[in-house]
Amino acid sequence: MVKTNPKVDTENEKSYLTVEEFNAIRKMDLPKDFLDFLEIGFRTGLRAADILNLKKENVKLKKDDNGNSTGHIQGTALKTKSQTPINIRLDQKSLSILKDRMGNIKSEFLFANRSGNPYTIEYFKKYFRKAFDQLYPDMALHKSIHAIRSGNRKFLEMYNLN
């Protein structure tokens, strides 16, 4: 449970997912698909729709000069009018998650249900809401699933990665 009171803490009044909330949710007993979705959204800043439509072909893996794995997500953003190209360098945690999903999922989609179809956003919203029920059991505080993406900026600033 997060120790701050969101009614008093102005940082939590923001619409983004805070780093503290992110870290607390990561430790919860929730489905791996949801936790992977959370990690990728928070670490990359991708929109939920873009994560749900990620395909194996969008993840570009290679080795650097030292033999270490590196990777990028490449594709086109779905929710932009100009069809903005996506080219996001992956940190080691995101890279590990996506490599694991690429090796263990038969579907071309990296976030697919048992039928091989991409999950719906409703699936992830359900667990995001459940996470907030656990974080703030005495309060009716819930954030939009889009708060995951919004928290990315603060996460990057916190670790001097922006």
What does each of the following model-derived ranges do?
Residues 2, 59, 111:
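Short clusters of hydrophobic/aromatic residues that line enzyme substrate/ligand-binding pockets
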Residues 2-48, 52:
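Basic, Lys/Arg- and aromatic-enriched nucleic-acid-binding interface segment
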Residues 11, 34, 69-71, 84, ...:
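Exposed loop/turn and edge beta-strand positions of beta-sandwich/beta-sheet ligand-binding modules
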Residues 15, 27-28, 84, 88, ...:
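Helix-turn-helix-type domain boundary/helix-start signal
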Residues 27, 32, 44, 104-108, ...:
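Short, basic (Lys/Arg/His-rich) helix/loop patches that form interaction surfaces
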Residues 79-99, 108-130:
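C-terminal catalytic core of Y-nucleophile DNA break-rejoin enzymes
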